[in-house]
C-alpha cells in the first residue's frame, strides 16, 4: 500500500477539480511549501491567494469568497489556524453557516530506530 501525506492528497484533488471548476480558490497563510500547495499555485495562479502571515484575514477572506459563490479552501499550519483565527472561524464561518473549508497541516519529525 502506498502512503502519501494528507496535504499532498488534498493538493492532488484540488489540482484535478480545478481543471474544470474555476470557482475553486485556495488561500494559504505563507505556507504553500509546508502545505504542499506549490503545484496548485504554479498551475492556477489566478485561483491561488497568498495571504501572508495573517490567519485571521485568511479565514475572513475565505468566508467572504464563499459568500460570493466561490469554493474556498484555506490552508494554514495547525498551531496557527486553531489559535490565531478562532474568532473568525466562529463568527465569519460557523455563525453565518458559510460553506468555506479550512484545513490544517502538521509536520512531525520522523526518527529511525
Predicted regions and their residues:
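Short, ordered loop/turn segments at secondary-structure junctions
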Residues: 31, 77-79, 106
